[in-house]
Amino acid sequence: MKRALVSVSDKQNLVPFVKGLVENGFEIISTGGTKRVLDEAGIETIGIEDVTHFPEILDGRVKTLNPYVHGGLLARRNLPEHMATLEKLNITPIDLVCVNLYPFKETIEKPGVEIADAIENIDIGGPSMVRSAAKNYHDVTIVVDQADYDEVLAQIKEDGETSLATRARLAAKAFRHTAAYDSLISQYLTKQTGLEDPEKLTLSWDLKETMRYGENSHQKAWLYEDALPKAFSVLQAKQLHGKKLSYNNIKDADEALRCIREFDEPTVVAMKHMNPCGIGRGDSLVQAWDRAYEADPVSIFGGVIALNRQVDLVTAEKMHKIFLEIVIAPGFDDDAFELLAKKKNIRLLTLDFSKKDEPTKHEVVSVMGGMLLQEQDMLKEDYHDWQCVTEKQPTEEQLKTLMFAWKAVKHAKSNAIVLANDERTLGVGEGQPNRIDSLKIAVKHAGEAIDDRTVMASDAFFPFGDCVEYAGQNGIKAIVQPGGSVRDQESIEMANKYGIAMVTTGIRHFRH
């Protein structure tokens, strides 16, 4: 008779699976709570202590760490000396292991969890059994996911055992399972110690979706989510309408969310190819939409739109007039949703914006042969901390407008320049190898909208005085920039020449 060892924390669909094993000639070894569930279901089981000849000790910390278990798992059936050892020691082979692990992830996700509770939910015996069974997959079937119950049972019913190919695949899955489990433990304990640069970095990600393709149609792509997901994320958004998000949709939506979380007043962000083409704010959402649209009515076509207020019908009627890829907001009024959903290709998503200021973990960027890890740029700034370096002092209204432009330029690709008034961006110049070209693009986009309220933000310092000179020649009245160039004085002199108020922040916001 074949033997299966069953010990799970997630008991969903367990009883039908084990009944199927029994019906196909397996006897069942089980432990603790799993044994109680199976006994109550009328399934005859063997207690683990009857196999190990040793009681559970230390409040269940030691149950299965025993040669009678691991010998039965690791013995190679095709080696006579292994089988002779089992016979000599009266160890019975174990042919199938069904194990999932203590709920460590669920424990550390609880608000205010104590480290002692987390420690008690670190499984030791479970991963050991999983690894032993997976190592010996030529002879042992390891099941760590209830999604595999039906396939395993079907093969056993058909052939009396699982195929070698299935066992190999399940073994690989089992090692991924334990690796991810250990990775979460490593991340948690590393965070508890405050270490920021561990010599070994382990990250755990769960496959969320296999994409149709990547950035281009010839590239394969997959979407993975952090095993401890962040609430304010496009991956946590609820899609109400439209086709699945593409690879590029997800990148643009992510960038739109990064940008809009900067703003508290009613704001609309239009994102295109991961660059803001229009940001508008107002006393109402429809006013913010009008201003974001006016910022660049050409580029917004086919854009990704993020709004930080529930979408009403008036705003929806205006959005409905143009083609948009995605609209993501805290919610939609019923009539607004009904109108927008008339276009089958638009994707409508909702997300809990109350979570936008939750601490964000690091961000990862891949490079060939490695990766870069950095904190996300979520620095909160106050314009009262800025330093005016010119003869002309900015007014309070100009400072507020400069802060709006400063938040916007933070999310444009470097070298980045944003021209704005107190209502919206007027022109965005981004991604140029030199800063003066970015400024010229921004001025071109702004056109005749430049007036006495127009200010300029630069994501990094001016290496020469040419940018400030060009700004002065085109009517810019105030500038915010980090400062710190060896030629800062050239820019200051140009600002004084054109009567520009210029402040420095001491903070750079490169984005690549």
Curated annotation (Swiss-Prot):
Q: Does the keyword DNA damage apply?
A: no
The GO annotation for biological process reads: 'de novo' IMP biosynthetic process
Reactions catalysed, semicolon-separated, are:
(6R)-10-formyltetrahydrofolate + 5-amino-1-(5-phospho-beta-D-ribosyl)imidazole-4-carboxamide = 5-formamido-1-(5-phospho-D-ribosyl)imidazole-4-carboxamide + (6S)-5,6,7,8-tetrahydrofolate; IMP + H2O = 5-formamido-1-(5-phospho-D-ribosyl)imidazole-4-carboxamide
Per its UniProt record, what InterPro entries does this chain match?
AICAR_Tfase_dup_dom_sf (IPR024051), Cytidine_deaminase-like (IPR016193), MGS-like_dom (IPR011607), MGS-like_dom_sf (IPR036914), PurH-like (IPR002695)
Q: What SUPFAM superfamilies does the record point to?
A: Cytidine deaminase-like, Methylglyoxal synthase-like
Q: Does the keyword Chloroplast apply?
A: no
Q: One cellular component GO annotation, for this chain's record?
A: cytosol
- Name the pathway it acts in: Purine metabolism; IMP biosynthesis via de novo pathway; 5-formamido-1-(5-phospho-D-ribosyl)imidazole-4-carboxamide from 5-amino-1-(5-phospho-D-ribosyl)imidazole-4-carboxamide (10-formyl THF route): step 1/1; Purine metabolism; IMP biosynthesis via de novo pathway; IMP from 5-formamido-1-(5-phospho-D-ribosyl)imidazole-4-carboxamide: step 1/1
List, alphabetically, the HAMAP family matched.
PurH
NCBIfam families for this protein: PRK00881.1 (NF002049), purH (TIGR00355)
Domain note: The IMP cyclohydrolase activity resides in the N-terminal region.
Family in the record: Belongs to the PurH family.
The protein's name is Bifunctional purine biosynthesis protein PurH
Q: What organism is listed for this UniProt entry?
A: Limosilactobacillus reuteri (strain DSM 20016) (Lactobacillus reuteri)
What taxonomic classification does the UniProt entry list for its organism? Bacteria, Bacillati, Bacillota, Bacilli, Lactobacillales
